[in-house]
């Protein structure tokens, strides 16, 4: 399920890489709970119980979570987005209950949590974005990034805004790692391993 500037659509994806089958389409642009509930009803989701993959915003709607910048935006754990040491703390309690008016839950869920697939592309984009943003813009590594992506504006590159094909191009560039510091090389290797072995490439 996904929306664009002009429509919202749901497609059925076969696990053996057959063609996508569109199962729902609407010109409504906003991913509201009412719209998604109607789409699920029209495709008779309750009898099929397909696995669902979507971006994190849509997953929040499916799970009945409050939208926007909230204290607990994750549907898997109780990560506190406003915690001062949120990146220092690595383990957060699992979200076991979806009780309305607790931990940013404002409605019942439309899809069981076990039926939601974490969107690997969005995770991959976030990993690479954060890595690129951590680079010093005056470094040799950043200058090499500019050479790899001459058409990307400096602002986009500094913000780490890459798409899927850009990420593939960067991961295939064998010389990029040689411009990184030792610590950055360790982080880069870890990101590549997670990207290839966990998220799939």
Predicted segments with their positions:
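A structural signal for the principal folded core domain
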Residues: 1-201
């Amino acid at each position: 399920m996904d929306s664009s500037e002009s429509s919202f659509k749901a497609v059925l994806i076969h696990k053996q890489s057959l063609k996508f089958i569109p199962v729902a389409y609407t010109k409504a642009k906003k991913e509201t709970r009412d719209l998604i509930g109607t789409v699920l009803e029209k495709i008779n989701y309750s009898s099929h119980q397909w696995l669902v993959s979507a971006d994190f915003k849509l997953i929040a709607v499916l799970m009945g979570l409050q939208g926007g910048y909230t204290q607990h935006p994750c549907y898997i754990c109780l990560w506190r987005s406003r915690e001062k040491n949120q990146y220092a703390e690595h383990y957060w309690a699992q979200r076991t209950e979806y009780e309305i008016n607790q931990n940013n839950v404002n409605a019942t869920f439309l899809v069981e949590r076990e039926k939601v697939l974490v969107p690997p592309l969005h995770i991959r984009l976030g990993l690479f974005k954060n890595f690129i943003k951590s680079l010093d813009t005056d470094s040799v590594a950043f200058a090499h990034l500019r050479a790899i992506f001459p058409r990307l504006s400096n602002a986009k590159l500094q913000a780490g805004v890459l798409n899927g094909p850009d990420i593939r191009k960067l991961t295939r560039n064998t010389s990029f790692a040689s411009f990184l510091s030792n610590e950055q090389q360790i982080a880069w290797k870890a990101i590549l391993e997670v990207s290839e072995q966990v998220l799939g490439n």
